[in-house]
Amino acid sequence: MKTPAELKYSKDHEWARQEGDVVFIGITDYAQGELGEIVYVDVTTEGETLEADEVFGSIEAVKTVSDLMMPIAGEVLEVNPDLEEQPELVNSDPYGAGWIIKVKAANAADFDNLLSAAEYEKLIAQ
């Protein structure tokens, strides 16, 4: 299982990668492994401003549906268009091509309050 050190993580198993004032968000390798084969990603919050810990969409696997939670507050700028036709990218490349949304962060401090890779690894080891 991969947990890239350059990313930040939430207790809800989302990751965040900051690139300038845009933050890419997806689910962790651990989360995709627990969910199993992803068949659909449903995000209808594009253009909305959401608070941290608010639901921004859902992800559907063969046997379950799970809410997707905002790790930071901000405006949902874009949903990954590739997931419409290839939701399995979340399984095969969760930290790259399988990103789910781009967000304009409302507060830079939110990003700093997320878990480091080491802290996230401790969380999932429990």
Curated annotation (Swiss-Prot):
InterPro entries: 2-oxoA_DH_lipoyl-BS, Biotin_lipoyl, GCV_H, GCV_H/Fam206, GCV_H_sub, Single_hybrid_motif. The keyword rRNA-binding does not apply. One of its GO terms (cellular component) is cytosol. Disulfide bonds: none annotated. Its cofactor is (R)-lipoate. The keyword Amino-acid biosynthesis does not apply. Keywords: Lipoyl. The glycine cleavage system catalyzes the degradation of glycine. The H protein shuttles the methylamine group of glycine from the P protein to the T protein. The glycine cleavage system is composed of four proteins: P, T, L and H. Belongs to the GcvH family. This is Glycine cleavage system H protein. It comes from Porphyromonas gingivalis (strain ATCC BAA-308 / W83).
